[in-house]
């Protein structure tokens, strides 16, 4: 069959190191035959072994979603609330500090922090940016050594728009205050027709790209992500991967690729009906992980599944499909869990290592930037120790 010849030719070219095209990636993503998918899996697994070996990394971190009050209305989001709506919350700085202290006491090396978009944090005559700088200081003043992985491109763009500041100014001030890296979320699918249906109030593809590249120029590394398994096609996914690879070749600022399969149990009825399922399809997610590994090649070597969305067993299976990282402990998670995910909100380092062992690989602890670390705690400042007594 012609398609089998094309499949072998595409995989052979990837194995030889030729850069995969967007149409080739779409072709692989469209494979439904189990035998064809196994060929893709095997090719991705071989490339993973060649690029990063047999060891699998994990990070001890805590996720803090500091507020769910948000002015935007993304069609898939069950997390956001209006300010006066039941269930709306905004953590005060003392609560955020408490969560950080608990994480540090548990050996965390990273705090990941994101929240809703709330113009009311501006205060009387102040800047929205000032609130975010205070958030950063609440963590970094007592814990200067903790790695702060905070604020998506959408959050940075929101601050710049509200305060009428250049995005470069916002990013520079956040970095100077203590933000060490950023989550590359709010990407969803970087294809405008899809974005207009899925999240029309979010920043555009072009604005996302410009914000990300500005962050990289500012010295802020970032994860890269894709929200898959909703209204997009195989070609849309491939186009998205192409946008990410183009950025990576220009800046080298992405640390990893994380696939975020759509969870829609609590999504609006119209979107649920259109997608036709509420939980991720594991086989589809695994194929996408494998194609991403082949597509990025040497330009982006760290690949992570989402155990929150796939469950730890599914994430462990992804280690056979090109992934070399099992993710973080998180300690808590609200955005995906409120959407109806069944993967849980917290994992212990022991559970992550066990999942890696189950996949017949060796686990090691890393930091946010994929440097191996020894298990250690970050000691709080003396003032915090005194306050805790």
From Swiss-Prot:
Cofactor(s) it depends on: [4Fe-4S] cluster
Keywords annotated in UniProt: 4Fe-4S, Iron, Iron-sulfur, Metal-binding, S-adenosyl-L-methionine, Transferase
InterPro entries referenced in this protein's UniProt entry, alphabetically: Aldolase_TIM (IPR013785), CofH/MnqC-like_C (IPR045567), CofH_family (IPR019940), F420 (IPR034405), FO_synthase_su2 (IPR020050), rSAM (IPR007197)
Record's cofactor remark: Binds 1 [4Fe-4S] cluster. The cluster is coordinated with 3 cysteines and an exchangeable S-adenosyl-L-methionine.
Domain Radical SAM core: 56-298
EC number(s) reported in the record: 2.5.1.147
Record: residues binding [4Fe-4S] cluster: 70, 74, 77
Keyword S-adenosyl-L-methionine: yes
Molecular functions (GO terms): 4 iron, 4 sulfur cluster binding; 5-amino-6-(D-ribitylamino)uracil--L-tyrosine 4-hydroxyphenyl transferase activity; 7,8-didemethyl-8-hydroxy-5-deazariboflavin synthase activity; iron ion binding
Entry-linked Pfam families: CofH_C (PF19288), Radical_SAM (PF04055)
Functional pathway: Cofactor biosynthesis; coenzyme F0 biosynthesis
Catalytic activity annotation: 5-amino-6-(D-ribitylamino)uracil + L-tyrosine + S-adenosyl-L-methionine = 5-amino-5-(4-hydroxybenzyl)-6-(D-ribitylimino)-5,6-dihydrouracil + 2-iminoacetate + 5'-deoxyadenosine + L-methionine + H(+)
Family membership: Belongs to the radical SAM superfamily. CofH family.
Stated role: Catalyzes the radical-mediated synthesis of 5-amino-5-(4-hydroxybenzyl)-6-(D-ribitylimino)-5,6-dihydrouracil from 5-amino-6-(D-ribitylamino)uracil and L-tyrosine.
Record note on quaternary structure: Consists of two subunits, CofG and CofH.
This protein's name: 5-amino-6-(D-ribitylamino)uracil--L-tyrosine 4-hydroxyphenyl transferase
Organism in which the protein naturally occurs: Gloeobacter violaceus (strain ATCC 29082 / PCC 7421)
Name of the gene this protein is made from: cofH
